[in-house]
Swiss-Prot record:
Biological role stated in the UniProt entry: Has an important function as a repair enzyme for proteins that have been inactivated by oxidation. Catalyzes the reversible oxidation-reduction of methionine sulfoxide in proteins to methionine.
Protein source organism: Methylobacterium sp. (strain 4-46)
Gene designation per UniProt: msrA
Catalytic activity: L-methionyl-[protein] + [thioredoxin]-disulfide + H2O = L-methionyl-(S)-S-oxide-[protein] + [thioredoxin]-dithiol; [thioredoxin]-disulfide + L-methionine + H2O = L-methionine (S)-S-oxide + [thioredoxin]-dithiol
Protein name in the entry: Peptide methionine sulfoxide reductase MsrA
EC number: 1.8.4.11
Biological process annotations from GO: cellular response to oxidative stress; protein modification process
Length: 221
């Protein structure tokens, strides 16, 4: 990842970069499964956005779930600047988070399994950072538009917060909200660790299991 001045606070309105009216070019197809990155997706496929630090490693966590995952992509969300570049996002002056778009079939892969992967794959108590990756674009975020899915996400947060407290961790700082516009990241970011298996991945969880109370089954069950 690139290293810019590390902002630990969201930009003020008069600091927001202007962006551009047209989308940036990105990959047409998923490097791993060959499906169209942007869709349209088949009937019954739902989408959710997850921010859990550097999106290179985060995306791999989700495409590796296998059955039920239609496609994954990385991009920028929960910010203000239209059609931002990666370099602009890294300045902290667009307001965006690095996120993974997950298109999945809930009949095969329950949303709860995505939640479990999300919570267990990063430390959601770190605020505007994940490990050595510091900045507003690395904040923990969960973005869904469906009210029922959002309620499910909030319930999982509350259950996981109890599990974390029991192990001595601080409060969860994850934002859960409507996704707003999602902007696909540049082509070279898509499925980055499939193209570069030895590439950077700073992702690390807390070691605390997502509790059964979230309605999620473990892989051993």
């Amino acid at each position: 990842m690139l290293f810019f001045r590390k902002r630990a606070e969201m930009p003020a309105p008069d600091q927001i970069l202007p962006g551009r009216p047209t989308p940036l070019p990105t990959a047409e197809r998923h490097f791993v499964n060959g499906r169209a990155l942007k869709g349209p997706y088949p009937e019954g496929i739902e989408t959710a956005l997850f921010g859990l630090g550097c999106f290179w490693g985060a995306e791999r966590k989700f495409w590796q779930l296998g059955d039920g995952i239609w496609v994954t992509a990385v991009g920028y969300a929960a910010g203000t600047t239209p059609n931002p570049t990666y370099e602009e996002v890294c300045t902290g002056l667009t307001g965006h988070n690095e996120v993974v778009l997950v298109a999945y079939d809930p009949a095969v892969l329950p949303f709860g399994q995505l939640l479990r992967t999300f919570w267990e794959s990063h430390d959601p108590t770190q605020g505007m950072r994940q490990g050595n990756d510091v900045g507003t674009q690395y904040r923990s975020g969960l973005y869904v538009s469906d009210p029922e899915r959002r309620a499910e996400a909030e319930a999982s947060r509350d259950a996981y917060a109890q599990a974390l407290r029991a192990k001595g961790f601080g409060s969860i700082t994850t934002e859960i909200r409507d996704p707003g516009p999602f902007y696909f990241a540049e082509a070279y970011h898509q499925q980055y660790l499939a193209k570069n298996p030895a590439g950077y991945c700073g992702l690390g969880g807390t070691g605390v299991a997502c509790p059964v109370g979230t309605g999620v089954r473990s892989a051993a069950e």
